[in-house]
Amino acid sequence: MIPLIAIVGPTAVGKTALSIRLAQQFNGEIVSVDSRQVYRGMDIGTAKPTPAERAAVPHHLIDIVDPDEAFSLAVYQDLATAAIADIAARGRLPFLVGGTGQYLAAVLQGWQLPRVAPRPDIRAALERQAAELGAAALYARLAEIDPAAAASIPPNNIRRIIRALEVYEATGKPISEQRSVQPPPYHTVTIWLTLPTPALYARIDARVEAMIAAGLLDEVHRLLERGYHWDLPSMSGLGYREFRPYFEGRITLDEAIARLKYDTHAFARRQPAWFRRLPNVLTLPADASDLQQQAATIVRQWIDA
């Protein structure tokens, strides 16, 4: 069994700082679990670790595809599994760090995912239906043909709804019937960082303001100039989609910033639903004065067990 330390928590809670200190202390390397940080050139809006942080500890699965390249849960799972095995084979301790709950669950629970290649023709037709009829209509259809999949997908997550319908139309089988679980060869402990909601929202708002000061608008402008359009999954994600109406002249910058804060608060509220499903979860207050000492004790006891 490969010892594996997962550090999870809502966005802006402090996962990066803690994971770097622990990885330095325990001869570790970090495998990012962030569906947005895989994209090159999307640095500020995804809150990637800084170059100095990435130089301090090796990081994996950051900057691996261009913003217009297809990227899926199955691809992520394969890459993360390979990275974890490589880190362990070199005698180092893998840390799985991030807040994309579905990616975490797929790796730590050993999901066996349907390997159905994207079908652009089917997807385009479904996207047209979504634009014409709304997400609720597609969700109702999914609930009719695959109740199990619908129960696991938020009704407003149109990309996952479309993917589930796409797999069904391509194969004739519900996506839920094509999934199974095979426990992976990991000895995992999950450290879940928490904060009271007001404190977390304050951190999120401060991060958003820091992103603006660091040049997020320039980053978005560069991406658009390079031909990456708003309908790409990368550009329609959190941190970028909120600025579309601003760049199109429909809202003010202050309104776009307020929208980003609001959307990030909502995202942070949804994240814990995934963390509760992870193996061997131990919660720690992210604002504890001895946070690193508490976390280091957990790691030491786990790898010695």
Swiss-Prot record:
EC number: 2.5.1.75
Region Interaction with substrate tRNA: start-end pairs: 34-37
InterPro entries associated with the record: Dimethylallyltransferase, IPT, P-loop_NTPase
Cofactor(s) needed: Mg(2+)
Catalytic activity: adenosine(37) in tRNA + dimethylallyl diphosphate = N(6)-dimethylallyladenosine(37) in tRNA + diphosphate
Feature type site, description Interaction with substrate tRNA: 100, 123
Transmembrane segments: none
Binding site for substrate: 11-16
Chain coiled-coil ranges: none
UniProt-recorded Gene Ontology molecular function terms: ATP binding; tRNA dimethylallyltransferase activity
List of residues binding ATP: 9-16
HAMAP family: IPP_trans
Similarity field: Belongs to the IPP transferase family.
Record's function text: Catalyzes the transfer of a dimethylallyl group onto the adenine at position 37 in tRNAs that read codons beginning with uridine, leading to the formation of N6-(dimethylallyl)adenosine (i(6)A).
Protein name: tRNA dimethylallyltransferase
Organism of this sequence: Roseiflexus sp. (strain RS-1)
